[in-house]
Curated annotation (Swiss-Prot):
Plays a role in virus cell tropism, and may be required for efficient virus replication in macrophages. It comes from African swine fever virus (isolate Tick/South Africa/Pretoriuskop Pr4/1996) (ASFV). InterPro entries: ASFV_fam_110 (IPR004848). Glycans are attached at residues 69-70, 105. Disulfide bonds: none annotated. Keywords: Glycoprotein, Signal. Belongs to the asfivirus MGF 110 family. The keyword Glycoprotein applies. Residues 1-20 form the signal peptide. It comes from the Viruses. This is Protein MGF 110-7L.
Length: 137
């Protein structure tokens, strides 16, 4: 009988540990950071996609870190912003480089993208050619 009770207590304790470690990964507190955990990028980049941590940029062309090659590449310009993110309980907050703050309820998130007008999709050969000056002919 004692073995059964100890077994049940052990199962309850282990399920509680799994549940608390899961909530730590996707919930709980996240101090202000320019580099959110890799497993949370999909969340943070879905609601404010212009954050620099959402993009891998090289030679002026950026590819999504979340959706990778399955997404459209973009031209690195004013659309890509330095952002810091933080989470305190159920409040998720973005601090964008111009001291613009966007807060939302983490469990009821809303997309926010005031920089959408600056987004330029990269098209092969369209942005690779430098404009030549007269003396470079």
């Amino acid at each position: 009988m004692l073995v059964i009770i100890l077994g049940i207590i052990g199962l309850l304790a282990s399920s509680n540990l799994v549940s608390s470690s899961t909530s730590t990964r996707v919930g709980g507190h996240l101090p202000l950071t320019f580099d959110p955990p890799e497993n949370e990028l999909g969340y943070w980049c879905t609601y404010v996609e212009s954050c620099r941590f959402c993009w891998d940029c090289e030679d002026g062309i950026c590819t999504s870190r979340v959706w990778g090659n399955n997404s459209t590449s973009i031209v690195e310009n004013d659309y890509v912003k330095y952002c810091e993110v933080s989470r305190w309980g159920n409040l998720c907050r973005y601090d964008v480089e111009e001291h613009i703050y966007y807060s939302m309820n983490c469990s009821d998130p809303k997309p926010w993208n005031p920089y959408k007008i600056a987004r330029k999709e990269w098209k092969k050969n369209e942005y690779l050619r430098k404009d030549l000056k007269k003396d470079e002919f």
